[in-house]
């Protein structure tokens, strides 16, 4: 049912100062520190435990009646 739901995963690689040979990128070099950095974006199925999913569901349900950008009133109301 939900097996096809995917989310973007962003990975940032910073190899500045690393002596390993970079063979993945074959395009033109920029000649500066950007040659040693990379951003990878992929789509994958998120893996979340049932316990974490239930906590988030309860959190979302608890706030569903709150309007956007309206602060919640905390504590008890004083009676004068």
Curated annotation (Swiss-Prot):
Binding residues for mesobiliverdin: 18, 24-25, 40
The protein's name in its UniProt record: Phycocyanin-645 alpha-1 chain
Gene3D superfamilies: Phycoerythrin alpha chain
Subunit structure: Heterotetramer of 2 different alpha chains and 2 identical beta chains which form 2 alpha-beta heterodimers within the heterotetramer.
Topology with respect to the bilayer: Peripheral membrane protein
UniProt key word Membrane: yes
Species in which this protein is naturally found: Chroomonas sp
InterPro entries: Globular_prot_asu/bsu, Phycoerythr-like_a_sf, Phycoerythr_a
């Amino acid at each position: 049912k939900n097996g096809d739901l995917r989310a973007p995963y962003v990975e940032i690689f910073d190899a500045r100062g690393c002596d390993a040979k970079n063979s993945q990128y074959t395009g033109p070099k920029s000649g500066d520190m950007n040659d040693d950095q990379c951003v990878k974006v992929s789509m994958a199925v998120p893996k979340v435990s049932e316990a974490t999913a239930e906590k988030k569901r309860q959190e979302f349900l608890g706030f569903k009646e709150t309007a956007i950008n309206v602060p919640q009133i905390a504590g008890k109301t004083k009676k004068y």
